[in-house]
């Protein structure tokens, strides 16, 4: 064993960490690499991300740790909000600034024309995923076909564009604009930018993309990997939001000690076992608390007059 190996500080053991890290992902880092680095910095036993963010995009990447991973699917299904910078008049091989320009056309539209084109993409639309994406065909990611110079048929997918707001527009002086897009899961902003360019007759590609919200989670309070690294090891878990930050839309229900014991055994609770002032409506998913001080026990849904556990957490 070398002297350097002998002098290396011992690796600290993994630990139980529960909560949601609101990570501001940097440019050029994949979501998986960001997760690996955050998990190492926190020394967490269990972690998972809530949907990928392209390496060329920055912004909000919620990472779930410990018991929060039980709710990661909810964020996968949540609406997303992005800010995107679009360059008109040029199409690239990848739909973004990393690709080669393959088509160049004059840009003759003004702000009114841009607004009219954007309006065509509001609501439910059919969108063909880009070749440079991680979607798979015959077990292979589409980007592998694209890198080999192949184009394969991709079925259009139905997505919903809830809102598009133009934040900045250089037209007609310069061929670019910035938009904020709120959309359903599975929406490709790169493709949306290209489609807007086609609607204007000039083509387009993305030059910048930043995610600013996932469901109710925003960049407010988000941290970078460098900020985590700068903290003392024992202070890092405090940088996570609590597990119930993922459940803000669910009304709270607090149980008595007796009801809590039954709930944690997976038993349903009759309406009479609940505080009538906080009992949820039929069909509503609630976040359930118990103990002193109250802590999150899980989520449950009111069905046929009884509160039925759906997911339990052990904090």
UniProtKB/Swiss-Prot annotation:
Family matches, as PANTHER family: PSEUDOURIDYLATE SYNTHASE TRUB1, TRNA-PSEUDOURIDINE SYNTHASE
GO BP annotation list: mRNA pseudouridine synthesis; tRNA pseudouridine synthesis
NCBIfam families to which the protein is assigned, alphabetical: TruB
Keywords (A to Z) from UniProt: Isomerase, tRNA processing
Record lineage: Bacteria, Pseudomonadati, Pseudomonadota, Betaproteobacteria, Burkholderiales
Entry annotation: catalytic residues: 54 (nucleophile)
Molecular function GO labels: RNA binding; tRNA pseudouridine(55) synthase activity
Annotated gene: truB
Pfam families referenced in this protein's UniProt entry, alphabetically: TruB-C_2 (PF09157), TruB_C_2 (PF16198), TruB_N (PF01509)
Enzyme class (EC, first level): isomerase
Domain of life: Bacteria
General function of this protein: Responsible for synthesis of pseudouridine from uracil-55 in the psi GC loop of transfer RNAs.
Catalytic activity: uridine(55) in tRNA = pseudouridine(55) in tRNA
Membrane spanning stretches: none
Entry's EC annotation: 5.4.99.25
Protein's organism: Cupriavidus pinatubonensis (strain JMP 134 / LMG 1197) (Cupriavidus necator (strain JMP 134))
Record-stated family: Belongs to the pseudouridine synthase TruB family. Type 1 subfamily.
CDD domains to which the protein is assigned, alphabetical: PseudoU_synth_EcTruB (cd02573), PUA_TruB_bacterial (cd21152)
Protein name: tRNA pseudouridine synthase B
SUPFAM superfamilies assigned: Pseudouridine synthase, PUA domain-like
